[in-house]
Swiss-Prot record:
Keyword Nucleotide-binding carried by entry: no
SUPFAM superfamilies: Winged helix' DNA-binding domain
Listed Low complexity bias regions: 1-19, 27-39
Source organism: Gallus gallus (Chicken)
Gene3D superfamilies: Winged helix-like DNA-binding domain superfamily/Winged helix DNA-binding domain (1.10.10.10)
Record GO cellular component, one term: nucleus
Cysteines engaged in disulfide bonds, as pairs: none
Protein name as annotated: Histone H1.10
Residue numbers carrying N-acetylserine: 2
GO molecular function: double-stranded DNA binding; nucleosomal DNA binding; structural constituent of chromatin
Any GO BP: negative regulation of DNA recombination
Job description of the protein: Histones H1 are necessary for the condensation of nucleosome chains into higher-order structures.
Domain of life: Eukaryota
Length: 220
């Protein structure tokens, strides 16, 4: 009994190893099935719309016919076709001329290059920090103006100095005017001297009185 038990254990381990070896093969097969074969739906739609020569656009029914003619399974991938049309319209590669949503007619946009250029332009909010840098030179440019105003202020200071010199120049005129009354005073002094002379002439008038006294003495 002890000899037969170890022989049964390896027999059970062998089928388990075979099952583990088969599982990776199934996983590899699943990975191969998931890989997309051929171009995407959006590429097929753009090719079909660009190939059409209709001015009003390619209808959904005509688009499905073109895709089926190219070997695409339209019945299985009907939902993918509609999603692809909506995404192309939202991106701007296709323009919907009729209908709404995925139904209607579609054509290529006239200027697809401009639409692609506009999308990256919207992604430039990083240029906003440059505005404060542009304001700094403006403030720096304002400072020299203030300095220029400070330089102009000495001119204003010079004007009061010039006014002071003018006032100083005018002051001698006032001094000369004040000196003129002194000349008048000196001119008046001879008049006073002239007035003194008649006072000295009064003793001459006393002589007649002495003559009268002599006449009175002679009469006696």
């Amino acid at each position: 009994m002890s000899e037969t038990a170890p022989a049964a254990a390896p027999a059970v381990a062998a089928p388990a190893a075979k099952a583990a070896a088969k599982k990776p093969k199934k996983a590899a097969g699943g990975a191969k099935a998931r890989k997309p074969a051929g171009p995407s739906v959006t590429e097929l739609i753009t090719k079909a719309v660009s190939a059409s020569k209709e001015r009003k656009g390619l209808s959904l029914a005509a688009l499905k016919k073109a895709l089926a003619a190219g070997g695409y399974d339209v019945e299985k991938n009907n939902s993918r076709i509609k999603l692809g049309l909506k995404s192309l319209v939202s991106k701007g590669t296709l323009v919907q001329t009729k209908g709404t949503g995925a139904s209607g007619s579609f054509r290529l946009s006239k200027k697809p290059g401009e639409v692609k250029e506009k999308a990256p332009r919207k992604r430039t909010p990083a240029a906003k920090p440059k505005k404060p840098a542009a304001k700094k030179p403006a403030s720096a440019a304002k400072k020299p103006k203030k300095a220029a105003a400070a330089k102009k202020s000495p001119k204003k200071a010079k004007k009061p100095a010039a006014a002071a010199t003018k006032k100083a120049a005018k002051s001698p005129k006032k001094a000369t005017k004040a000196a003129k009354p002194k000349k008048a005073a000196t001119a008046k002094s001879p008049a006073k001297a002239k007035a003194v002379k008649p006072k000295a002439a009064k003793p001459k008038a006393a002589k007649p009185k002495a003559a009268k006294a002599k006449k009175a003495a002679a009469k006696k």
